[in-house]
Amino acid sequence: PLPAHHIRVIAVQNGGGFGGKSDPFNHEICAAKMSMLTGRPVKIALTREEVFFCHRGRHPVLMRSKMGVSKTGRITALDFESYLDGGAYGSYGTASTFYTGALQTVTYAVENYHFRGARFFTCKAPCGPKRGHGTVQPRFAIEVQLDKIACDLGLDPAQMSLDKLAPRASATANHTRIRP
């Protein structure tokens, strides 16, 4: 084994992780082993395309959303379910499942909120964290639902969204603080 005092990690300024740097991947293990075998430093440099090939993809998500809205478009209740297809391995599935629910009340003022979620192992390619992991799929679903509700109420969807934004320095239904 390589003694710990012989290991030097140089972390360069390369931006945030956003999920893509959360899991250890095969090429990182190979680089460590190559360094042990050669006794020399090993550098990994991936192109943007290679990053997409070797990192995990987004979770397919089955969602059910039931929303209570007043005639003026005020969101009185949101009942949201999300079921994530995690593929064959665990990865950051718990966090992705949590985010599908925890962040749905941040954008708009929601008076009452209920969330249920689960992540399932399947015989598919593994899924994991990606930029905005766990939030992109449900955000799309909620926005489409709000647009349909606005049309049913005879309201402009964009204006209704702007009018219903969560106020600054407020707390969401699940006690997340909105920055002032």
What are these regions (language model features)?
Residues P1-P180:
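Structural alpha/beta core scaffold segments of enzyme domains
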